[in-house]
Amino acid sequence: MTASRRTLMVMAGGTGGHVFPGLAVAHRMEAAGWRVVWLGNPAGMEATLVPKHGIPMEYVRFGGLRGKGLKTKLALPFNLLRACAQSLAALRRVRPDVVLGMGGYITFPAGVMTALSGRPLVLHEQNSIAGLANKVLAKLAKRVLVAFPGALPHAEWTGNPIRAELARTEPPKARYAARSGPLNVLVVGGSLGAAALNEVVPRALALLAPGERPRVVHQAGAKHIDALKANYEAAGFAAGDDVRLVPFIDDMAAAYAAADLVICRSGAMTVSEIAAVGVAALFVPFPYAVDDHQTTNAAFLADAGAAVLVQQRDLSAELLADWLRGQSRASLAAMAERSRSLAKPEATDEVARVCATVAGANLESLQ
């Protein structure tokens, strides 16, 4: 059977942390001549995003229990059986040679039915702490891949699949050496914004003398841009004071590459992207993440001296201002180089090769 006649089913949904790495692998497999079909939730972001990438979809309705009421919990057995039936029907329609599970609630019933139907399952865990579903599915999968070492026992450390442009960024040593003047700081609140960063960073900058202040690009989240502008104005900043406020950033590769320091949360993809580019980071983990996995994600780089980890409860304008005063471009460049050394820039190709191997395909098709 030739690669052009082989089919990969990607099952992923719910958040960008599951969907975007899945898309990276999907496009890599398509480039090698594979047919790709996506299994997702019709209510998830994947239902809108994935078709825009030209990938056909199959749907399974299934959600989590966290934060839900008694009615939803009592309906779990029925909903799980329905999701299993929908998953099996999709598998029979698509007849994939291999199924790649990238996370999200639907991965559990679909992964179980993949194994029960005799089709090979490859599992990828993006976070440093695996959820319950992946801990169960890992026992059923042919190969188990992780973004962070030790996330699952007996797993292969491949890193997180990322966008190709991030892996192609110029090495940090050359980037930092070419700069002079104030430090360039990128503050990333994510698509939803990070209120703690939006409140503390302006006040911290105000505590610095004008000659100590960095140039700042602060991404607020679309719903938070007006509040962020008010925070900077309250801290005494006006438009043009080396501070640029934006609701979102289209080209994150360029934004990371232009920064000496990134101040941000520590979701799995953010940590992986920062390492791939090679840029110094100050991580403030989201304190309500499941199993506090953002702290463990950040610790992967922080424990190696490749980033700094500050818990939100400890973050203050005074602490941040004092820390910024102690940084130089040289110290941040050293941090960036350590970060780059821990990256897995070939993660997308590696995950794709594992899928091909499990399906019995010729690896030459992925060269």
UniProtKB/Swiss-Prot annotation:
Alphabetic keyword roster: Cell cycle, Cell division, Cell inner membrane, Cell membrane, Cell shape, Cell wall biogenesis/degradation, Glycosyltransferase, Membrane, Peptidoglycan synthesis, Transferase
One GO term of the biological process aspect: lipid glycosylation
Membrane topology field: Peripheral membrane protein
InterPro entries registered for this protein in UniProt: GlcNAc_MurG, Glyco_trans_28_C, GlycoTrans_28_N
GO molecular function, one term: undecaprenyldiphospho-muramoylpentapeptide beta-N-acetylglucosaminyltransferase activity
Binding site residues for UDP-N-acetyl-alpha-D-glucosamine: 15-17, 127, 163, 191, 249, 294
Domain of life: Bacteria
Record-annotated membrane-spanning stretches: none
Enzyme Commission number(s) of this protein: 2.4.1.227
Enzyme class: transferase
Main location: membrane
Recorded catalytic activity of this chain's protein: di-trans,octa-cis-undecaprenyl diphospho-N-acetyl-alpha-D-muramoyl-L-alanyl-D-glutamyl-meso-2,6-diaminopimeloyl-D-alanyl-D-alanine + UDP-N-acetyl-alpha-D-glucosamine = di-trans,octa-cis-undecaprenyl diphospho-[N-acetyl-alpha-D-glucosaminyl-(1->4)]-N-acetyl-alpha-D-muramoyl-L-alanyl-D-glutamyl-meso-2,6-diaminopimeloyl-D-alanyl-D-alanine + UDP + H(+)
Coiled coil location: none
Pathway: Cell wall biogenesis; peptidoglycan biosynthesis
Places the protein is found: Cell inner membrane
Cellular component GO terms held in the UniProt record: plasma membrane
NCBIfam families: murG
Family recorded in the similarity comment: Belongs to the glycosyltransferase 28 family. MurG subfamily.
Role this protein plays: Cell wall formation. Catalyzes the transfer of a GlcNAc subunit on undecaprenyl-pyrophosphoryl-MurNAc-pentapeptide (lipid intermediate I) to form undecaprenyl-pyrophosphoryl-MurNAc-(pentapeptide)GlcNAc (lipid intermediate II).
Protein name per Swiss-Prot or TrEMBL: UDP-N-acetylglucosamine--N-acetylmuramyl-(pentapeptide) pyrophosphoryl-undecaprenol N-acetylglucosamine transferase
Organism from which the protein derives: Burkholderia multivorans (strain ATCC 17616 / 249)
Gene that encodes the chain: murG
